[in-house]
């Protein structure tokens, strides 16, 4: 039965990729075999059309639960990437001059279409990325919330005025779009992260070049089709595909004014440096090592549930996964119960009923996670729960790692210093809250952290002293809702303006200030003033 389900799921994905992205060649049909020459190809989206790439370089898309090839995505050619930017540049003046109310209406229609197609988008995510269907729906929903927030643009883009700054003179400023903006998205949130980017940028009047992860392009392609159906003019949103060459193209192209990136530290540092060197605004959300500090007065049952869910959900492939627990004082005694609770999680393919977590994205990701677990044992830590040898019936070729808990971890160990990005929770122990705060602050990352306590003074002390951009109090994954901004800090972020919220609007716009004087009478002096104007002195 499992094999039948796998085949059906793969067939469904092939059919949807074809339906969404092969508009230019309606005679092409998916073949019944899985050979690399017959699986559906993901198209480019340029000037409002889904176009077959002329590239001779193609990347296989795999179902992480089976490692079967379910699609192929091109590495866009230089000419194709140039055409995409040219389309953005050509359509920018008209889109920027479009009434903000009209742009708002496009986004209002878009959020409704996302709601209507949420389950279909989630299924694409599940097949390409490996998430459970429930988690994939959450991926889409959190992106949808940003789209809904973007619909408030008429309030978010209000300017400032100061009348009568001096006699007959007024001062006012307003926000204008930048031009062509670009986004580079990761594999772990195929819907949410693109929806952090292009809706916010485009409602401000920018046009947008999107490069989804080559591992999970399906959701972005469907989101682009829905955006077009919402009334967005052709050419305002364009999509290219690729790897290193596409990234360099985005960083270097003179017509691209701003870059949004989410992904690894290595890639983020590179993009920030190269893009900034070419005069672009860059915002880069990067790696993390998120700590959950457990105080002995915490609500025990709630805390254990929160730790397990935040550590192992999405197989740990979240930049806000709670990958590190610090047990303070008597909370150390809860460790056996934490292990027992994690053992109950069900590992399976994402579409299987009752699955709590699915596979990792690639065999290479699985190997890396297993090697980091190995490093813990070699460096003196203890493995209390080992998920390396897990086998999922019917999905023996999948990239599965079960929940893993490593105790007796020290800050100098590799499994602590590295971002694992898998279903692994490393556990440290301290005697005091101050020791826990020092551990968190000595770590270079600053994405998120959480404290579990019933003491308000303890929570306040931790929130104020910890050097992390996003703090949860009895909230394990403190990702802000989009009326606020995603405020990772230190080594987890590069740039000076964060994603979505008010800062998202600031990133995608520039200020223009007008100083205006309308005199009722003609000048009483016959000679010009050559000293610095003081305006109101």
Curated annotation (Swiss-Prot):
The active site is at residue 319. This is Methylmalonate-semialdehyde/malonate-semialdehyde dehydrogenase [acylating], mitochondrial. Keywords: Acetylation, Mitochondrion, NAD, Oxidoreductase, Phosphoprotein, Transit peptide. Its EC number is 1.2.1.27. Its main location: mitochondrion. The modification N6-acetyllysine is found at residues 49, 54, 57, 78, 89, 119, 131, 300, 332-333, 366, 378, 502. It is found in: Mitochondrion. One of its GO terms (cellular component) is mitochondrion. Malonate and methylmalonate semialdehyde dehydrogenase involved in the catabolism of valine, thymine, and compounds catabolized by way of beta-alanine, including uracil and cytidine. The modification N6-succinyllysine is found at residues 49, 54, 57, 78, 119, 131, 366, 378, 393, 519. It comes from Bos taurus. One of its GO terms (biological process) is valine catabolic process. Belongs to the aldehyde dehydrogenase family. PROSITE patterns: ALDEHYDE_DEHYDR_CYS. The lineage of its organism: Eukaryota, Metazoa, Chordata, Craniata, Vertebrata. InterPro entries: Ald_DH/histidinol_DH, Ald_DH_C, Ald_DH_CS_CYS, Ald_DH_N, Aldehyde_DH_dom, MeMal-semiAld_DH. One of its GO terms (molecular function) is methylmalonate-semialdehyde dehydrogenase (acylating, NAD) activity. The keyword Mitochondrion applies. Homodimer. Residues 1-34 form a transit peptide. It is an enzyme of class 1 (oxidoreductase). NAD(+) binds at residues 185, 187, 211, 214-215, 264, 419.
């Amino acid at each position: 039965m499992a094999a039948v389900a796998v085949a059906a799921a793969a067939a469904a994905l092939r059919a949807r990729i074809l339906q969404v992205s092969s508009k230019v060649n309606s005679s092409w049909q998916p073949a019944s075999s899985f050979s690399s020459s017959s699986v559906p190809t993901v198209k480019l989206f340029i000037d409002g059309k889904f176009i077959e790439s002329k590239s001779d370089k193609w990347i296989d898309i795999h179902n992480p639960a089976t490692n079967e090839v379910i699609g192929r995505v091109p590495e866009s050619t230089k000419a194709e990437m140039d055409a995409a930017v040219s389309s953005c540049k050509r359509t920018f003046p008209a889109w920027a001059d479009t009434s903000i109310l009209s742009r708002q209406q496009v986004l209002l229609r878009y959020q409704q279409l996302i709601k209507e197609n949420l389950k279909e988008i989630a299924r694409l995510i599940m097949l390409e990325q490996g998430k459970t269907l429930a988690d994939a729906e959450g991926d889409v929903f959190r992106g949808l919330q940003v789209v809904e927030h973007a619909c408030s643009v008429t309030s978010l883009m209000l300017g400032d005025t100061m009348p009568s700054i001096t006699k007959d003179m007024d001062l006012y400023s307003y926000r204008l779009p930048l031009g062509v903006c670009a986004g580079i998205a990761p594999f772990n949130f195929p819907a949410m992260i693109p929806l952090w980017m292009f809706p916010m940028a485009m409602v401000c009047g920018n046009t947008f070049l999107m490069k989804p992860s080559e591992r999970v392009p399906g959701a972005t392609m469907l989101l682009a089709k829905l955006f077009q159906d919402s009334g967005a003019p052709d050419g305002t949103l364009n999509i290219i595909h690729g790897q290193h060459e596409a990234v360099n193209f985005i960083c270097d192209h003179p017509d691209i004014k701003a870059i949004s990136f989410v992904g690894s530290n290595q890639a983020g540092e590179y993009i920030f440096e190269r893009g900034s060197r070419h005069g672009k605004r860059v915002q880069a959300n990067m790696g993390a090592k998120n700590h959950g500090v457990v105080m002995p007065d915490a609500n025990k049952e709630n805390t254990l549930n929160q730790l397990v869910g935040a550590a192992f959900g999405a197989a740990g492939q979240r930049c806000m996964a709670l990958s590190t627990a610090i047990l303070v004082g008597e909370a150390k005694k809860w460790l056996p119960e934490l292990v027992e609770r994690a053992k109950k999680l069900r590992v399976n393919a994402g579409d299987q009923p009752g699955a709590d977590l699915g596979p990792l994205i690639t065999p290479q990701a699985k190997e890396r996670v297993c090697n980091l677990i190995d490093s813990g044992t070699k460096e003196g830590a203890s493995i209390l729960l080992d998920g390396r040898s897990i086998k999922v019936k019917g999905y023996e070729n999948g990239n599965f790692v079960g929940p893993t808990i490593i105790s007796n971890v020290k800050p100098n160990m590799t499994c602590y210093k590295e971002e694992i990005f898998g279903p692994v929770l490393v556990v440290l122990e301290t005697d005091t809250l101050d020791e826990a705060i020092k551990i968190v602050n000595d770590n270079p990352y600053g994405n998120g952290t959480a404290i579990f306590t019933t003491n308000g003074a303890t929570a306040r002390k931790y929130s104020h002293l910890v050097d992390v951009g996003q703090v949860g109090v009895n909230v394990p994954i403190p990702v802000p809702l989009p009326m606020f901004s995603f405020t990772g800090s230190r080594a987890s972020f590069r740039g000076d303006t964060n994603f979505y919220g008010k800062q998202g609007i600031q990133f995608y716009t520039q200020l223009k200030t007008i100083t205006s004087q309308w005199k009722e009478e003609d000048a009483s002096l016959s000679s010009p003033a050559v000293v610095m104007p003081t305006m109101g002195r």
